[in-house]
UniProtKB/Swiss-Prot annotation:
GO MF terms, alphabetically ordered: DNA-binding transcription factor activity, RNA polymerase II-specific; RNA polymerase II cis-regulatory region sequence-specific DNA binding
Record's protein name: Transcription factor SOX-8
Dimerization (DIM): region residues: 67-107
Pfam families assigned: HMG_box, Sox_N
SMART domains linked: HMG
Biased composition (Low complexity): 338-349
Entries under PROSITE patterns matching the protein: HMG_BOX_2 (PS50118)
Residue numbers spanned by region Disordered: 1-60, 163-257, 327-381
Any one Gene Ontology cellular component term annotated for this protein: nucleus
DNA-binding feature ranges: 109-177
Signal sequence segment: none
GO BP terms in the entry: enteric nervous system development; heart valve development; morphogenesis of an epithelium; negative regulation of transcription by RNA polymerase II; neural crest cell development; oligodendrocyte differentiation; peripheral nervous system development
Annotated gene: SOX8
């Protein structure tokens, strides 16, 4: 141990010396022939520090350094250094904990190498010398492949060496027990999001767009073609419980949609005529329970709105987009109409001629139209709940064919009667206002209302609605 300290003395300058940490090799060389400073004996300004290494690092490579130091510096410098450092007790120097593992309470014992590691270590050294440019990761991959190709005979020397190492390890550390580091558990959110992604993708790339204020769920198609527009509502991922109930409907629905989607990808809704909706899809519609969706009512008090604005006042103008029915993106889209939108009475007065009414395009229009006409000129894909309603229209009622759709659960005027008295400023999002360029879509061609459920059963005349596009 005494010998070691001698070598340390030569290798290192006293930590108390300010020059020790800062002086570089060039500094040392330039001073190498200067006379010894008297201050050196106090250990304050001893110039010839052989290396700028911190004190704690000395023990690691001391022997090598001692040999190097001997050759690098003239004898007078070496003597001066050893003279200065001789009286210093190196056991007092604090060692950095991470710098030297042996000082830890329990030094880490590595596992003995297995046969592959023996092979890889030897081969890596050899290859790294021959091909220094090889990246270590690539090297490891290649070594692994080679190892698999080796025959038993070729592997034998490595296996034997590994066995020898294991026995030796057991001797050295009789009570050794392998304790692997605990892995951090997979984040809980991760698995959830994966299952969520699965859910949303099995329905034909649906993105449930939840309108924070309006609770409307739109479809991935709308998302796709309006992706360029900065004013889309926020889209938190949702996995509503209704998904379970409507699994079978989804199958039905997406059959149709897939056919159409195989056509072209993007749709321009300004050219869409909803009257092309195929009647067979309408006839396939099934019922679902309106009250199941009450949990999705918006929190901003639309439910409490006075109901005295129109004849169907007792009912909310909820329009269930068919994403609600089938895709489980259950959204009640609350669409409040501006005074221009028709209440049944205004429709009656104009019975003789078809009306054209201008209406706001509300989020539910998005969800239905984008959902319902996800693809293109043939609307065979339109299904469960959409039924040709661009649900935001007050007159969307006319879109129900009187065929086998059973609407007992959709308390009729859910579709028909919005709040005609509400001004357009009711929209929370500025992009629902009609200030954008309008596009006219003749919506309801020959479809009439199911008389049994309609409070306004005398509307037989189809009503055309002009929608304004946000």
């Amino acid at each position: 141990m005494l010998n070691m300290t001698e070598e340390h003395d030569k290798a290192l300058e006293a930590p108390c010396s300010p020059a020790g940490t800062t002086s570089s090799m060039s500094h040392v060389d330039s001073d190498s022939d200067s006379p010894l400073s008297p201050a050196g004996s106090e250990g304050l300004g001893c110039a010839p520090a052989p290396a700028p290494r911190p004190p704690g690092a000395a023990p690691l490579g001391a022997k090598v350094d001692a040999a190097e130091v001997d050759e690098r510096f003239p004898a007078c410098i070496r003597d001066a250094v050893s003279q200065v450092l001789k009286g210093y007790d190196w056991s007092l120097v604090p060692m950095p904990v991470r710098g030297n593992g042996s000082l830890k309470a329990k030094p880490h014992v590595k596992r003995p190498m297995n046969a592959f590691m023996v092979w890889a270590q030897a081969a890596r050294r050899k290859l790294a010398d021959q091909y220094p440019h090889l990246h270590n990761a690539e090297l490891s991959k290649t070594l692994g492949k080679l190892w698999r190709l080796l025959s038993e005979n070729e592997k034998r020397p490595f296996v034997e060496e590994a066995e020898r190492l294991r026995v030796q390890h057991k001797k050295d550390h009789p009570d050794y027990k392998y304790q692997p580091r605990r892995r951090k558990s997979v984040k809980a959110g991760q698995s959830d999001s994966d299952s969520g992604a699965e859910l949303s993708h099995h329905a034909g790339t649906q993105i449930y767009k939840a309108d924070s204020g309006l609770g409307g769920m739109a479809d991935g198609h709308h998302h796709g073609e309006h992706a360029g527009q900065p004013h889309g509502p926020p889209t938190p991922p949702t996995t509503p419980k209704t998904d379970l109930h409507h699994g079978s409907k989804q199958e039905l629905k997406h059959e149709g949609r897939r056919l159409v989607e195989s056509g072209r990808q993007n749709i321009d809704f300004s050219n869409v005529d909803i009257s092309e909706l195929s009647s067979e899809v309408i006839n396939n519609m099934e019922t679902f329970d309106v009250h199941e969706f009450d949990q999705y009512l918006p929190l901003n008090g639309h439910t409490a709105m006075p109901a005295d604005h129109g004849p169907g006042a007792g009912f909310y103008s909820t329009s269930y987009s068919h994403s609600a029915a089938g895709a489980g993106g259950a959204g009640q889209v609350w669409t409040h109409k501006s005074p221009a939108s028709a209440s049944p009475s205004s429709a009656d007065s104009g019975q003789q001629r078809p009306h054209i009414k201008t209406e706001q395009l509300s989020p539910s229009h998005y969800s239905d139209q984008s959902h319902g006409s996800p693809a293109h000129s043939d609307y065979g894909s339109y299904s469960t709940q959409a039924c040709a309603t661009t649900a935001s229209t007050a007159t969307a009622a006319a879109s129900f064919s009187s065929s086998q759709c059973d609407y007992t659960d959709l308390q009729s005027s859910n579709y028909y009667n919005p709040y005609p008295g509400y001004p357009s400023s009711i929209y929370q999002y500025p992009y629902f206002h009609s200030s954008r360029r309008p596009y006219a879509t003749p919506i309801l061609n020959g479809l009439s209302i199911p008389p049994a459920h309609s409070p306004t059963a005398n509307w037989d005349q189809p009503v055309y609605t002009t929608l304004t596009r946000p």
